[in-house]
């Protein structure tokens, strides 16, 4: 274990300390060292938060409850854990100082989500609008723009108003399409004159699987044979219904966006959450490795990319899932096709994948349908990537490059924004502040992924326009609670939610420094001499 740690640290030092000369091409400029100047002009660098994870102020300004309020309260009361997500990190009251953190990081952009129930407390416009909630996002957007930071706004990041969940089951019902469309239209009309980058749905794969297949996320529905904690749900069925309605809701919002006069010049997209898959056994003769990887991509990324690009689900899913997979009408297919200006990608890690026939047809599930088995090691014992002891998943930056290239080749070479990429680590209560701030592994993670991204943009010519760190600061990591941290800034939950700069933030701020044109011209000239 000690040797492994030394090797990991050694590799980290080589990557971080050694100067990296980057030679440009048709897409990217040459630069003497790796940094902001290595990427094309206008490339956006930003950081993220989300409403439920960070805002707090759950009962202020007339905000209504969401399914995540209910879910975390239930989990908190049953297990006495630290999962009361209503606390967030009080971004609601600290947003002005948090915008200054973005400036200190030399960030160009900030991605955040709107809490549906903070705007429409009962989920519906005709049941009342919270003007306090409307003002909060208005003030936040103005504060960002006044400080030279571009807002990228997500409409739905998993927090369905509890009122709609109670009324008709949220995304289990197509009744939500009209309510989501009204919410989207309202947001576009209020903020579209200043917000020019919009996301409809964040990670439909994660929301539908976690909430309606495994029960690990709100609203916690699944079959007992999947998760004993679930008290309601139907795995292998509801997951497909919810995904179907998410896609249709996305299309409704995009159609509304296209009509929005204030939104002229803006762009809208959806955020996907793909992993990359490597074959567990490349020498297997029973199941070709290419077919397994393609099936894995179809059941994850393709599930929600094929419909919005080509108008229907992947054939591999239709063949296996059959009647449990809802069908699109001809009109819905036309509305879905091409319903995005960019694709957002949240990427965190990769895995090995193998075919399995070990499924029970009497217990339907997405996992059984996919016939996929995931492994951290391949058949020869090699790991997919390095994984420090506290890390939530292996560091596999090359997977980001492969995912981006896959999207370019399979989905009409779209404009892409890496809307989330971050290192999550679980810290014990005994970990003190100085240890948490010394996050060298997070620096290593982001450097490796930025280098992989550079390869995708500059060598593979993937049309990537931006990179967002997930996240700006620590917050509620959904079902993992507050012990798992992913921020560039440490949040001291026990002392007034104080923000503390981690080493990764200092490093990234330096990396993203804007070089004056006169200095950059000399750098470019010197770089050409080296050639």
Curated annotation (Swiss-Prot):
Entries under Gene3D superfamilies matching the protein: Glycosidases
Keywords, in A-Z order: Disulfide bond, Hydrolase, Signal
GO biological process: carbohydrate metabolic process
Active-site residues per Swiss-Prot or TrEMBL entry: 203
Record InterPro entries: Glyco_hydro_1, Glyco_hydro_1_N_CS, Glycoside_hydrolase_SF
Amino acids binding a beta-D-glucoside: 53, 202-203, 348, 477-478
Protein name: Probable inactive beta-glucosidase 25
Gene that specifies this protein: BGLU25
């Amino acid at each position: 274990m000690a040797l492994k740690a030394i090797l990991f640290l050694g590799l980290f030092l080589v990557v971080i300390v050694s100067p990296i000369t980057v030679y440009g091409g048709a897409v990217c400029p040459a630069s003497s060292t790796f940094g902001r100047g290595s990427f094309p002009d206008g490339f956006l660098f930003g950081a993220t938060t989300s409403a439920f994870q960070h805002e707090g102020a759950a009962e202020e300004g007339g905000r209504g409850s969401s399914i995540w309020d209910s879910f975390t309260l239930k989990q908190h009361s049953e297990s006495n854990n630290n999962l009361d997500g209503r606390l967030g990190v009080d971004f609601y009251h600290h947003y002005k100082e948090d915008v200054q953190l973005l400036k200190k990081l030399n960030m160009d952009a900030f991605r955040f989500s709107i809490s549906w129930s903070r705007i429409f407390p009962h989920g519906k416009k005709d049941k009342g609008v919270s003007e306090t909630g409307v003002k909060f996002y208005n003030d936040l957007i103005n504060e960002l723009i006044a400080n030279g930071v571009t807002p990228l706004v997500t409409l739905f990041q998993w927090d369905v108003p509890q009122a709609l969940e109670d009324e008709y089951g949220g995304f289990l019902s197509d009744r939500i399409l009209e309510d989501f469309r009204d919410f989207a239209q309202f947001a576009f009309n209020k903020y579209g004159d200043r917000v020019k980058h919009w996301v409809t749905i964040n990670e439909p794969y994660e929301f539908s699987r976690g909430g309606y297949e495994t029960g690990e996320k709100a609203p916690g529905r699944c079959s007992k044979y999947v998760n004993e904690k679930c008290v309601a749900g139907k795995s292998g069925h509801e997951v497909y219904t919810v995904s179907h309605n998410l896609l249709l809701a996305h299309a409704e919002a995009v159609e509304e966006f296209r009509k929005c006069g204030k939104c002229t010049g803006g762009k809208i997209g959806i955020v996907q959450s793909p992993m990359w898959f490597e074959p567990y056994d490349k020498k297997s003769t029973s199941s070709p490795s290419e077919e397994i990887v393609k099936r894995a991509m179809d059941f994850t990324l393709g599930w929600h990319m094929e419909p919005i690009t080509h108008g229907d689900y992947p054939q591999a899913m239709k063949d296996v899932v059959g009647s449990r997979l809802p069908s699109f009408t001809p009109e819905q297919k036309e509305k879905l096709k091409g319903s995005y200006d960019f694709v957002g990608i949240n990427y965190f890690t990769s895995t090995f994948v193998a075919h399995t026939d070990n499924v029970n047809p009497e217990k339907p599930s997405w996992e059984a349908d996919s016939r996929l088995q995931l492994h951290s090691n391949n058949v020869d014992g090699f790991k997919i990537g390095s994984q420090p002891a506290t890390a939530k998943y292996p560091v596999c930056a090359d997977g980001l490059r492969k995912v981006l290239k896959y999207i370019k080749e399979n989905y009409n070479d779209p404009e892409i924004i890496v809307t989330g990429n971050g290192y999550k680590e679980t810290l014990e209560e005994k970990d003190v502040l100085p240890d948490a701030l010394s996050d060298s592994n997070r620096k290593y993670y982001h450097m490796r992924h930025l280098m992989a991204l550079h390869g995708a943009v500059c060598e593979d010519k993937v049309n990537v326009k931006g990179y967002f760190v997930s996240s700006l600061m620590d917050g509620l990591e959904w079902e993992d609670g507050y012990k798992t941290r992913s921020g560039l800034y440490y949040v001291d939950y026990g002392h007034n939610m104080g923000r503390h700069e981690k080493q990764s933030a200092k490093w990234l701020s330096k990396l993203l420094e804007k070089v004056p044109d006169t200095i950059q011209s000399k750098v470019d000239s010197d770089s050409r001499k080296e050639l």
